[in-house]
Amino acid sequence: MTLYQTEQQERVHLQQVISIINDTIHNTDTSVKEHVETLQEYKDYIWSNKDIDPHEIRSMRESILNHFALGESVIDKRRRLGRILDIPYFGRIDFKEKKNGANILPIYIGIHTFYDSQSKMNLIYDWRAPISSMFYDYELGEATYTSPVGEISGDVSLKRQYRIRKGKMEYMIESSLTVHDEILQKELSNNADDKMRNIVTTIQREQNRIIRNEEAHILIIQGVAGSGKTSIALHRIAYLLYTLKEDISSKDILIISPNKVFGDYISNVLPELGEESVPETSMEQILSEVLENKYKYQSFFEQVTELLGKTTQSFIERIKYKSSFDFISQLDKFILFMENNYFKATDVKLTRHITIPSEYIKEQFRRFNRYPMRQRFEAMTDYLLEMMKVQYYFTVTTADRNLLKKEIKKMFAGNNDLQVYKEFFEWIGNPELFKLQKNRILEYTDLAPLAYLHLSLYGNITQCRVKHLLIDEMQDYSPIQYKVIQKLYPCRKTILGDASQSVNPYGSSTAGMIRKAFTMGEVMKLCKSYRSTFEITDFAQKIQTNNELEPIMRHGEFPSVLQFENTEKESSGIIDLISSFKKSGYKSLGIVCKTEAQAKELAESLQTYTAEVYFLSNQSSAFVKGIIVTSSHMAKGLEFDEAIIPVSYTHLRAHETLSDL
């Protein structure tokens, strides 16, 4: 195979590969059409010949099934070809085996293998193929991979990465390390000097340590703003899918993300994942399902909105207490108190002649103390009936079993989760810490402790199907929420976020708090901020300082602070900035307001000027490029090429400063 060395040669090669893919697509389309026509011919023949003998029917059935299977295979091939047409590959290594006479083999790596039947060669190797492992596992120099015939050793003499979109190469880079982040790739592609190359190499080594960490059962990543933590976490998923492909697939991984928009936003970050989508859910959905969707509750978004608006100190105090470890400790003590005080055994008259004495029932309650409270009733019922059967030759019916179970359940004073939860606050002497909203709606901060109490009484509903759990925006979840996650998901976990980016400072968690909640976990820190320019990072540091953040000298324009006399002139200024954005060539502009109500009002105002403005609300389910107006809560975790933050001092409450926004 020809060794393409220059960027121009690589561009020519790319177009040659795309041309061959297009030819293959044309041939595949023809093959699909032929299979459809053949199946239709069989169908027509059967309909027009009613007197077909059984032997011919069996023969035709075999032929139809074969054609159907082949057709499905061809359709699947066509689908894969369609996927690689826009981005045929993203990496290349040149590899030479150690055996004598071996030639250097250029290996192009993409989301699917592509074999050219004309040249009888693999033009693209699947990123999961054994030979592709050297792209991820080795720098330049000696390398090995395990093939079906054994271990192959040799030398990697070249490593390249490409940014290809819609069949066009935007840039390529050469680096001994595999650089995962697009912004770092761009820096290297822009003829970066040795200093920047060293910085990028350092960042990539730090990221690789996280991506390839297979030892930690719980990996907690504390990353400052702009450190690329979300991208790293998703590449970690790709790496785990590759290295553990015999044990884990995409359906075995679950992502907990803050909202539907964020889930959609990250879904296209990894071309390496190919067609494998990873299931996503939210913390609210998990907690509500534990409680069997019985309760109406305030969403996290609604809680944040209330905190940003007019709220009471008592509301804040309720959130703060229920986000503390003292709260968890008291709840555990109360569950133990229930164990000793909520079960009052009574005699049960099973038949006219058989009565089970209360002391015997109480003894069995203690006997089965290894079971959660309500599971214990099942075990007690079965055991007591078995004893009656042995002692009295009693024939047990379903009605007898149901009666005894019902009577035992009545002896327990904790059958109503919500009532028990309310009694807990009376038990600790602070009944005012529990308050239902209008229409008996639970406050968001009560959802997790109620689920925790439910699991403690009913037993864990262990989600064994999930083999790896990824939690993003870790700071937005409280310790009690992590305790529920611990009960539900015993699997390995990757948890990431930034303690300084919480939208609810009263109910947030640091990496240390999360580690304490799980009683284990390895914490890894990312302090280098590179996804924003030095000027933007420096500007943000002046508003709210983060002493752990290390800005990278990637320069750009200084942020502008514009002053307006009133909101009308502010809107006019925003319209001018939108006009400049349209001419800039950038793809996304985020206009971020403090609350959703303010964002909606501004979006409606701007939409009279241009229909291209999109309002991203809590109800939105997809992230779109272009001009987006949204709230600070919804914008968290998203990235924009340009951003506008309208700050009207009429929106600031008396005690607030700019840093609170």
Predicted segments with their positions:
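Alpha-helical nucleic-acid-binding subdomain
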Residues: 241-470, 476-484, 492
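P-loop NTPase Walker
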Residues: 1-33, 40, 184-303
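Short, charged/polar micro-motifs that form catalytic or ligand-binding hotspots
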Residues: 79, 83, 189, 193, ...
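Extended, charged low-complexity regulatory segments
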Residues: 1-200, 204, 208-212
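Generic detector of solvent-exposed, compositionally biased contiguous segments
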Residues: 54-73, 211-217, 222-224, 228-231, ...
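Conserved helicase motor core of SF1/SF2 NTP-dependent helicases
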Residues: 246, 260-276, 281-286, 292-302, ...
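Extended, solvent-exposed polar beta/coil surface segments
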Residues: 1, 658-660
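Short, well-ordered alpha-helical scaffold segments within catalytic/effector domains
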Residues: 196-200, 204-208, 234, 238, ...
